[in-house]
UniProtKB/Swiss-Prot annotation:
Assembly notes: Part of the 50S ribosomal subunit; part of the 5S rRNA/L5/L18/L25 subcomplex. Contacts the 5S rRNA. Binds to the 5S rRNA independently of L5 and L18.
CDD domains given in the database record: Ribosomal_L25_TL5_CTC (cd00495)
Organismal lineage: Bacteria, Pseudomonadati, Campylobacterota, Epsilonproteobacteria, Campylobacterales
Biological source species: Campylobacter hominis (strain ATCC BAA-381 / DSM 21671 / CCUG 45161 / LMG 19568 / NCTC 13146 / CH001A)
UniProt keywords, alphabetically: Ribonucleoprotein, Ribosomal protein, RNA-binding, rRNA-binding
NCBIfam families given in the database record: bL25_bact_ctc, PRK05618.1-4
UniProt feature coiled coil, ranges: none
PANTHER family: RIBOSOMAL PROTEIN L25/GLN-TRNA SYNTHETASE, ANTI-CODON-BINDING DOMAIN-CONTAINING PROTEIN, RIBOSOMAL PROTEIN L25_GLN-TRNA SYNTHETASE, ANTI-CODON-BINDING DOMAIN-CONTAINING PROTEIN
Job of this protein: This is one of the proteins that binds to the 5S RNA in the ribosome where it forms part of the central protuberance.
GO cellular component assignments: cytosolic large ribosomal subunit
Designated name of the protein: Large ribosomal subunit protein bL25
Length: 178
């Protein structure tokens, strides 16, 4: 479980001091909750996010435990270091919008025919309750030939989960090499 501290002051000066000490600035929020300004050790945060097996993970701040998902993050443009992260509290019975990653498996037939695999959507916005939140969408691209694509409507959805994106948007496809 990831443990963090509550930030008392939210100004620029204190944020810079925390970053200098190896902390990642975070905002934790949900509908009906007061925003929590927190900070986590950067290395601990990265380890937990890489090792997690489900989309939501637990954080502990000020003796309270929250189940959260990463809603947004900011990186430094040159060093690529994490600067800020927004975490959304997952409420089991509250319907909300979440970003779910798309995982590609298999080797497309079109790659052997001089095609290029193009993934246009890395995450899809879904609307569901926290208890129904899928960990990821797994798409098998083995049957895709050149100029074929998988659309949002081709994704098999669990019960009580709907995708907010337009049904005719391509998620992954094989295009011809130029």
């Amino acid at each position: 479980m990831l443990e963090g501290i509550v930030r008392e002051s939210i100004g620029r000066k204190s944020s810079k001091a925390l970053r200098r000490d190896g902390y990642l600035i975070a905002n934790i929020y949900a509908k009906g909750f007061k925003n929590i300004n927190a900070a986590f050790k950067v290395n601990d945060f990265i380890k937990v996010v890489k090792a997690k097996t489900t989309l939501p993970f637990e954080v502990k701040i000020a003796d309270k435990t929250y189940k959260v998902v990463v809603q947004d993050y900011q990186k430094h443009p040159v060093t690529n270091a994490l600067k800020h992260v927004d975490l959304r509290i997952v409420l089991d019975n509250e319907i909300s919008h979440y970003l779910v990653p798309v995982k590609i498996v298999g080797v497309a037939k079109g790659l052997r025919n001089k095609g290029i695999l193009v993934q246009s959507k890395r995450r899809l916005t879904v609307k569901c309750a926290g208890k129904d939140l899928p960990n990821e969408f797994v798409l098998d691209v083995s049957d895709l030939d050149v100029n074929d694509s998988l659309l949002v409507r081709d994704i098999k959805l669990p019960d009580n989960v709907s995708i907010v994106e337009n049904n005719s948007v391509a998620v992954v496809g094989v295009s011809t090499a130029q």
